[in-house]
A protein has these predicted regions:
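Solvent-exposed loop/turn segments at secondary-structure junctions
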Residues: 78-79, 106-109, 126-128, 137-139, ...
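Zn2+-dependent peptidoglycan hydrolase active-site motif and core
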Residues: 85-89, 93-136, 166-170
Length: 200
């Protein structure tokens, strides 16, 4: 990751990273709301309470009980992955500038993986990873640089639990902050979503 970080960010002392990250995260202009045509009232729960990081382990997909993410819901009562208001797919947008480092596009209903069709984007300014899950379509490829607000894919119902009728159609959005020792630690994106730029 350090190689990627060095390639895609301005040359600054590593000891200033936390100050720079804190500054960027406080300004709403840095982030784009990740769903076109929707706003903060689409975020699940009250005041972001759906976020639960306790027990999270990125390297153990069988770990249960945590939910270190925000779910953002859309109007899709018939669960066909189309917006009830427009009868069109719902665009998933990149929250920030970054490098696509991984995607999944071949999820099937027989798979036990919970994320379905997902996208990982590395933000070298924040030195962290954004994870966008449950997409019906992925329209970026690994190695592609994306801009804030750029379309990554389309919302769907892929994933072990997300495709079931009990689950409303939503984006599962997670952010992992990479620590100096290289381990990823989840951070709540709710404050960023509240100030993010909206896209029509």
């Amino acid at each position: 990751m350090r190689g990627l970080q060095g390639r895609f960010r301005s040359a600054q002392s590593y000891r200033n990273d936390s100050l720079q990250r804190d500054s960027l995260r406080r300004t709403g202009r840095y982030f784009s709301f990740p769903i076109r045509g929707y706003a903060t009232n689409a975020i699940g729960g009250i005041h972001g309470e759906g976020y639960r990081a306790n027990g999270f382990d990125l390297f153990d997909y069988k770990a249960r009980g945590s939910h270190p993410a925000q779910d953002i819901f859309v109007a899709d009562r018939n669960q066909n992955s189309l917006d009830d208001r427009t009868s069109q797919p719902v665009d998933i947008l990149s929250m920030s500038n970054g490098l696509v480092i991984g995607i999944e596009t071949a999820w099937t209903s027989g798979s036990e993986y919970r994320g379905g069709n997902w996208i990982w984007v590395y933000d070298p300014n924040l030195h962290g990873l954004f994870y966008y899950a449950h997409n019906s379509a992925v329209q970026v490829v690994p190695g592609q640089w994306v801009q804030t607000g750029q379309k990554l894919g389309e919302m769907g119902r892929t994933g072990f639990n997300a495709y079931k009728t009990r689950s409303p159609t939503h984006l599962h959005l997670m952010y992992l902050q990479i620590q100096p020792d290289g381990l990823p630690i989840p951070l709540d994106t709710y404050p960023w979503l509240l100030t993010a730029r909206l896209s029509k």
